[in-house]
Amino acid sequence: MTFSALRRHFLLASLTLTLGAGLLGQAQAADDLLAQIKSKGEVRVGLEGTYPPFSFQDENGKLAGFEVDFSNLIAKELGATAKLQPTKWDGILAALESKRLDLVINQVTISEERKKKYDFSDAYTVSGIQALVRKGDEGKYDAPEKLAGVKVGVGLGTNYEQWLREHVPQADVRTYEDDPTKFQDLRSGRIDVILVDRLAAFDMVNKTKGAMALTGAPFARQEAGIALRKGNPELLAALNKAIEKFRADGTLKKLSEKWFQADVTQ
């Protein structure tokens, strides 16, 4: 091989390596969701928007609530703004899988089953599965076994439905796509009990001025984390870093006390 041919071969090899590295870098950047979020300056967050005090529409029609505030704080730590996308619960994780959402911040309980499909941040609230009844019925349904044969309302596809079917298969399970209808059916007597997040139950008792009541201690402990698609370690690390910061500087506690008058974050 002549010197000129050798030189051409070397230049072609160098060019190939350079182009290959560039394409690899572009592919990695395309796959790095955190980088995409920072580049766009926007993170798409899924929440229900009908689940007070976590997310709901205020008197002006604007989204408000604990998880609305929390989403905005998280987005700021990621160098972006939160694009809040109200989504029904039974489709919210599917929207995450199909990449219509980047994150779901909607009291998604961390469970071993869900961890097979999604990654979760560290927990940002700690609660439990709470039975909520009409005032005066507290003693009737204060244990899981007392729900056998009883009309129990749960959100469709929620961990409450799953827990009820697993632990009280004799219950008369009534599923709902939205919370307002479920609460209305309890008040009107169409169902006897609803299973909800303990924190949401406290809020409902306050709003109904004592027309509803908790049956006692929660039936099971649950922790909620931010759900995201697997394969985004940089984003997961950034979320955990933000949550740890908010926990350490008291931001999470203040936010909790604003919406629940108690610290529900640990």
Where are these regions (language model features)?
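Extracytoplasmic small-molecule ligand-binding "clamshell" domains
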Residues: A29-Q107, K116, D249
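Short loop->beta-strand "edge-of-pocket" segments that line small-molecule binding or catalytic clefts
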Residues: G41-L47, A143-G157
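Alpha-to-beta junction loops
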Residues: V43-R44, G79-T81, S98-N106, V150-K151, ...
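Extended ligand-binding regions for polar small-molecule ligands
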Residues: D69-E77, D137, V150-K151, G155-N159, ...
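Acidic, polar ligand-binding/catalytic clefts
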Residues: N72, K76, T81-K146, M212-A213, ...
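A ligand-binding cleft/hinge motif common to bilobed small-molecule-binding domains
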Residues: G91, V108-K116, W163-E166, R187-A220
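Periplasmic-binding protein-like
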Residues: V126-V133, T181, R198-E244, F260-Q266
